[in-house]
Amino acid sequence: MGRDIYKDETLTIPKGVTVDIKARNVTVTGPRGTLKQNLRHVDIEMKKQGNTIKFIVWHGSRKHNACIRSVYSIINNMIIGVTQGFRYKMRLVYAHFPININLTENGTVVEIRNFLGERITRVIKCLPGVTVSISSAVKDEIILEGNSLENVSQSAANIKQICNVRNKDIRKFLDGIYVSERGNIEELEE
């Protein structure tokens, strides 16, 4: 297999969003706030031309060419984050012992009590920019919201992971906190 001499991908920047690229440090600013991402470790040429960004790889191998789409997706998710935001909904699942959730420090720290009847309190600090709220419409549901997809999804994963059932048959003990729905905070009007 030979190498591709040139491969590129183009991302269009929507109105109301500004993207700054300096030495592969990307800053995206929109109506919901600002997100920054350091992409210096990726050997890709990024050029901003008007309202588009062009990602270029010269003489790239198969894995090097795959980096183009990864960087494209990262920056596209940042643009969606500063325009619409991200929301994850998680459901509390229990058979016998009801799981209690307390939110502290303005919804950035989650305390889980009475998981499988245990007396231990499990504490999860959410990543920066993520706020947690308890749903008023649905019983036993928490909502994670933020601008950064990476931070919101990793915070949801941390909450799910701390409630793993150990030393028991997981087919029988289905207790835990699971992601039930994910999407955007503000849906675009078509």
Swiss-Prot record:
Protein role: Component of the ribosome, a large ribonucleoprotein complex responsible for the synthesis of proteins in the cell. The small ribosomal subunit (SSU) binds messenger RNAs (mRNAs) and translates the encoded message by selecting cognate aminoacyl-transfer RNA (tRNA) molecules. The large subunit (LSU) contains the ribosomal catalytic site termed the peptidyl transferase center (PTC), which catalyzes the formation of peptide bonds, thereby polymerizing the amino acids delivered by tRNAs into a polypeptide chain.
Organism placement in taxonomy: Eukaryota, Fungi, Dikarya, Ascomycota, Taphrinomycotina
UniProt-listed Gene3D superfamilies: Ribosomal protein L6, alpha-beta domain
GO annotation, cellular component aspect: cytosol; cytosolic large ribosomal subunit; nucleus; preribosome
Superkingdom of origin organism: Eukaryota
Database matches in Pfam families: Ribosomal_L6
Description of how the protein assembles with itself and partners: Component of the large ribosomal subunit (LSU). Mature yeast ribosomes consist of a small (40S) and a large (60S) subunit. The 40S small subunit contains 1 molecule of ribosomal RNA (18S rRNA) and at least 33 different proteins. The large 60S subunit contains 3 rRNA molecules (25S, 5.8S and 5S rRNA) and at least 46 different proteins. uL6 lines the binding pocket for eukaryotic elongation factor 2 (eEF2).
Organism: Schizosaccharomyces pombe (strain 972 / ATCC 24843)
GO molecular function list: rRNA binding; structural constituent of ribosome
InterPro entries in the record: Ribosomal_uL6-like, Ribosomal_uL6-like_a/b-dom_sf, Ribosomal_uL6_a/b-dom, Ribosomal_uL6_CS2
Protein keywords: Cytoplasm, Nucleus, Ribonucleoprotein, Ribosomal protein
Primary residence: cytoplasm
Family recorded in the similarity comment: Belongs to the universal ribosomal protein uL6 family.
Subcellular location: Cytoplasm; Nucleus
GO BP, one annotated term: cytoplasmic translation
Misc. remarks from the entry: There are 2 genes for uL6 in S.pombe.
Entry-linked PROSITE patterns: RIBOSOMAL_L6_2
The protein's name: Large ribosomal subunit protein uL6A
